[in-house]
């Protein structure tokens, strides 16, 4: 940064020297120095000269002061961290360290055939990336396969089916497995996910898969059931995992078709199985379903259970578990004050706020610190796309996974989005300062999970070097023009007319040159092929 400022000052001096060199004729600098002595020169100066000199120097000083303030505002914390960070690294753990780029499965993932494929047919755009689908294939292999499947033809075929890249090949392979064993639950799950046109059809296939896996589990003896927790029967564990997965997807089908009580009951039953429900993140599905029926007391109890919301222990000293947890807890606090909240949007210092309003603002700020990509989607500043099947915590993918299903809950509460907008306007300048809270690896990893046609959200939004240089040159040009307009108004006006005339001539010459080799219908030709942007 110091090198760039040195370069700018040297550039300033060089521009002034070049300007004086080219204006030595109109300004008659050499004649003035030869014919007029210093004493007579200063005696002949009018008060207008001193007024112009004072104004110009004040302008230059103000510009320098603004640049210095901008520099120290953006780099003071970095320099202080470099000096003092080494003394505290070993003794104090920073609670806001950059998280690892660990990929998490989206518990609210849509059905590929019934939902993702409909979007692809309507927009002719791929909603999922191959990397995202490959991660799903790995998840299915780990959930639905085990080492004891060797020698069982249908399960060996399903191992091949999950690895197939194309959907048609996976479907054909699953049908081959069903031809061998009509009660193969994993094959039915694959067909429900990728070979059904509607959610209702997917639900029917999943119910058939549930009956098949329950028949398989009923064949286990009581001794095997008693020894499962201790000895870890891998085959039974695999079958229980398949059963839990199918029940969760059936509850999601009920939620999508408006049977909310049935969906909540299914999610509650699954949440009692701690190990499997935690593995599949059933609590996120349960929280969203309770929000849909406006059971806010149940949502608060779930947050206390899964994220420590409302407790006075170490909640304020640690990071939230996910964007869904942090923004849901903020929504509950905003709900109590949003309708009667009155705050000027341009004021960053709020006075006379109640404790509930301050708590709501702090909760929103905390949620934005965890994932600042969410508010632009909730406020509909950025275009929404289909959520991916996997996401990265604190990334744009997690923001899409949350906002896609929860934006309706924010709209339902009067004043919630208005309060979110007010806090967001004050938060954007702050998050752009913190260049160390978000890793560049997170942004590049998100690109693998999101489609290429999606404009990815990035924080902090730093200014480009080209923009900074353009702003600097504009300030320098304004200062030079101000000096010339005060010192030599007649010569300055003539020179300005020459510059404008030269610019117009250059524009006309360039347009004539372009029209000589470009076809006459190039504008209609370009306008006839607009870029198609996928719409939801």
Curated annotation (Swiss-Prot):
Its main location: membrane. It is found in: Membrane. Pfam families: ST7 (PF04184). Keywords: Coiled coil, Membrane, Transmembrane, Transmembrane helix. Disulfide bonds: none annotated. One of its GO terms (cellular component) is membrane. It comes from the Eukaryota. The chain crosses the membrane at residues 3-23, 49-69, 464-484. The keyword Transmembrane helix applies. It is a multi-pass membrane protein. InterPro entries: ST7. Residues 192-219 form a coiled coil. PANTHER family: PROTEIN ST7 HOMOLOG, SUPPRESSION OF TUMORIGENICITY 7. Belongs to the ST7 family. This is Protein ST7 homolog.
